[in-house]
Amino acid sequence: MRTLLTCALTALLASVSAANAGAVVWKFEHKALVGSESIAGAVAESSLMAPGLKTVCDFSYGMTISNSNLKAAGKVSEVAISNCHTDSKACTVKSSTAQKLPWSAHGTTVGSTSYVVVEGVKFSILYAGEECALGETLVTFSGTAGGKYDNTAGTFTFDKASFLATGTAIEGLTEWNATFSTEALGPHKGQLLELG
């Protein structure tokens, strides 16, 4: 009987461990977040590489985070895209808009590295210019973005390596380079946000 209970307990612990493999939680001051927190952040000069054209924009966001079932979760409810320009003299940016908000987010690990994965990402850029091949064309980018989280700086970075590590992609982009800041706006204001 004792052996049977030991085997059952071992199997249960193994299944819980497997279910939480790759799971991480949000932390402030090395303690797991209890309840929820509002986070804001931004990046200047985010580089979006599409076939034949590089577009640079500033992004800012607002997100609510929590730990759900011992896993970091979040909802990106606000995204502003501004100050966009291209590397082409012929092409300008007429407008840029985030769509289908909120976007869901969660934390994960690949090896020993923590990542923020944002799902349901969708934004559009309207290009202009008489000699621009994309002039008066609304280009929509959509998909899932995985960014490497830096616990010492409280930032997450989207780049080719982070997309590859997380198996994520944004349709229409060959590369997205951006390092987003994080800042708590509620009871944890002034504290460094960690993911682990």
Label the model's feature ranges:
Residues 1-21:
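Secretory targeting and sorting signals
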Residues 11, 16, 33-35, 110, ...:
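Residue-level detector of solvent-exposed, low-hydrophobicity positions
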Residues 21-80, 164-196:
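N-terminal segment immediately downstream of the Sec signal-peptide cleavage site
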Residues 26, 121, 139, 154-156, ...:
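Short non-domain terminal segments
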Residues 53-152:
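Predominantly extracellular/secreted and cell-surface proteins with exposed
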Residues 142-170:
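Extracytosolic low-complexity repeat regions of secreted or lipid-anchored proteins
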